[in-house]
Regions:
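Feature responds to low-complexity, polar/acidic, surface-exposed segments characteristic
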Residues: 1-12, 16-43, 52-115, 129-188
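Surface-exposed binding/hinge segments that line
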Residues: 119, 124
Length: 189
């Protein structure tokens, strides 16, 4: 199970979960950005990430939701979700993959495989939960923002703050963390 691959659609949903945007994704289910996601249970997540320019299609108006996600695609999605795309001048997959390694997204992940596994995804998402997000800051009515790394409001802290008591209720799991919770909920979405 941990060694199985994960699809592009499933990974999109997990990125939305990590960003704590499930409610927003639910409002995006009827958006028609891609012709091949209408029947996908993850269509809201895919559409939201497309609108936010975190994912792109595969050409001809398609997303290919059932294809396994490649390691470099996962790196690009996570780097963009963290906001670091603003410092990437070369938008090749290699550049995003390099940046993902630099900021810690790929720590403890085998980068030699073309496709990521469930285990790789869990490690990458868990890494992202603790990486400071790149956020825009506006100074003196300047229209163009400056960007800073916000070490205080990581996805983990934002996720934990979103629950009433700051805890995450787990069902059927003895020991787990936020990334395990995010993954365990993918089938129920």
């Amino acid at each position: 199970h941990l060694d199985s691959n994960i699809t592009r659609a499933e990974f999109a949903q997990l990125v939305v979960n990590m960003m704590n945007h499930k409610a927003v994704a639910a409002t995006m289910e009827s958006a028609g950005y891609f012709s091949d996601v209408a029947d996908s249970p993850y269509k809201g997540a895919i559409n939201l990430l497309y609108k936010e320019e975190i994912v792109s299609g595969t050409g001809n108006g398609t997303f290919d939701p059932n294809r396994n996600v490649r390691y470099q695609e996962a790196c690009k999605m996570l780097v963009k979700a963290l906001g670091y795309h603003v410092i990437v001048s070369d938008t090749s997959l290699d550049s995003y993959t390099f940046l993902a390694g630099t900021i810690g997204v790929t720590d403890n992940v085998d980068s030699s495989k073309e496709y990521i596994t469930v285990k790789d995804m869990l490690v990458m998402v868990d890494n992202c939960l603790d990486i400071g997000r790149m956020v825009p800051m506006y100074y003196n009515d300047n229209i163009a923002p400056s960007y800073i790394i916000d070490e205080e409001d990581t996805f983990r802290s934002l996720f934990e703050k979103s629950t009433p008591d700051g805890t995450i209720k787990m069902e059927g799991i003895v020991t787990a963390d936020a990334s395990t919770y995010l993954y365990s909920k993918r089938e129920s979405l």
